[in-house]
Amino acid sequence: MTCQVTQKAREGTINPIFTCQPAGAQFASIGIKDCIGIVHGGQGCVMFVRLLISQHMKESFEIASSSVHEDGAVFGALDRVETAVEVLLTRYPDVKVVPIITTCSTEIIGDDVDGLLSKLEDELLPTKFPGREVHLLTVHCPSFVGSMITGYDKAVHDFVKKFATKDEPSDKINLITGWVNPGDVKELKHLLEVMEVKANVLFEVESFDSPLMPDLEHHSHGSTTIEDLRDTANAKGTIALNRYEGMKAADYLKKKFKVPAVIGPTPVGIRNTDAFLKAVSEMTGQPIPAQLVKERGLALDAIADIGHMFLADKRVAIYANPDLAIGLTEFCLDLEMKPKLLLLGDDNSGYVKDPRVVALQENAPDLEIVTNADFWDLESRIQQGLELDLILGHSKGRFISIDYKVPMVRVGFPTYDRAGMYRHPVLGYGGAMFLAETMANTLFADMEAKKNKEWILNVW
């Protein structure tokens, strides 16, 4: 058998793996300090996305809606945007960045949001908010094409394009994290800190894992500042961890400001983390210190303790954001596991030419890769006889795990039916250790439930 990359055989979608473009743009916007986005569309385009993110992070945050109703969908709804901007700026005096995120309905009716924002900058802002720093921009998200991944990538590009300003050269690098968890940001910043590398960490959500303090002070907002975004044009280079969640912005900085760019690999597992640290070292001239060599060794030791005996030859199905899903598949191969099914949940034609996917086709002969996939592609294959030992993916696939009694490790977005998953990294050496041990523990619990409560290590 050879690894095949195929597109979903059906036209319709049964239980999608991804949601639509505006969700990705909203997730990018919450990584910016003093930023509240306005989603130009129906209230559901905000409510359900905000619910997903809040369930995942276990934190509250602000996203506004222009609340387009039936009349606006027929006759146009630009007046709703104008009202929304004025109300938002009045109610939140500290807000400096207001992206207008379009949706399928407002893109179809052709609302000229760009033209309206020019009008607001000339009339509303000088009149109602004189002397106040306010930045308006449009993020076009026609949600009838692409997915939340497309929307995130577009938003990252549009924010960088809006603010990047050439000035004196900086000693920092740009790190575009992509769609990650607070625990991942913490791990990435730790790696950079140990290497004594300064960075503009873009669209970072570490503060969504924030403490409850005695004075009741509580913040859960993004930490990337306007100054960080402006300084991206002056950096030593850009590292975009994810090909589909930041490459457009990295390419823009490279073409416009001659900022060197490195795209990936997503640092899932030992091998990819090694590549990430090598890229940082080459870009900055900083050596990889002994502390990180030790952390790498600890991760390797933890993996050696469980890898061959408990993980080897285990059959896995994987779905998640594309860069994460591909990274997880590569890590599973490194652990001697057998990835059987990789589901990529949108119709990006670039997947077939992705060098990582090409490598998977060469190195994983038993793997089937399905693009534009949905959960029926997983469930139907199980019904047809696909035997799996483990599923890796977000919480939306939990019913397949339950119904077919296949143990599942929650990873990716959204994860809301297991406590604290957003707090633990899956990137870096710490993430490699956490992932391997979580997979092993999940298999242990499943074996105890199905086979022998007093299991013997050397017989399974």
Swiss-Prot record:
Residue numbers binding [8Fe-7S] cluster: 20, 45, 104, 143
Entry note: cofactor: Binds 1 [8Fe-7S] cluster per heterodimer.
Biological processes per GO annotation: nitrogen fixation
Cofactor(s) the record lists: [8Fe-7S] cluster
SUPFAM superfamilies for the chain: Helical backbone' metal receptor
Keywords: ATP-binding, Iron, Iron-sulfur, Metal-binding, Nitrogen fixation, Nucleotide-binding, Oxidoreductase
Catalytic function, reaction form: N2 + 8 reduced [2Fe-2S]-[ferredoxin] + 16 ATP + 16 H2O = H2 + 8 oxidized [2Fe-2S]-[ferredoxin] + 2 NH4(+) + 16 ADP + 16 phosphate + 6 H(+)
Enzyme class: oxidoreductase
Keyword field contains Oxidoreductase: yes
GO MF annotations, alphabetized: ATP binding; iron-sulfur cluster binding; metal ion binding; nitrogenase activity
Superkingdom of source: Bacteria
Record EC number: 1.18.6.1
The protein's role, per its UniProt record: This iron-iron protein is part of the nitrogenase complex that catalyzes the key enzymatic reactions in nitrogen fixation. Other nitrogenase complexes utilize a molybdenum-iron protein or a vanadium-iron protein.
Homology family: Belongs to the NifD/NifK/NifE/NifN family.
Quaternary structure and partners: Hexamer of two alpha, two beta, and two delta chains.
Protein name: Nitrogenase iron-iron protein beta chain
Source species: Rhodobacter capsulatus (Rhodopseudomonas capsulata)
Lineage: Bacteria, Pseudomonadati, Pseudomonadota, Alphaproteobacteria, Rhodobacterales
GN (gene name): anfK
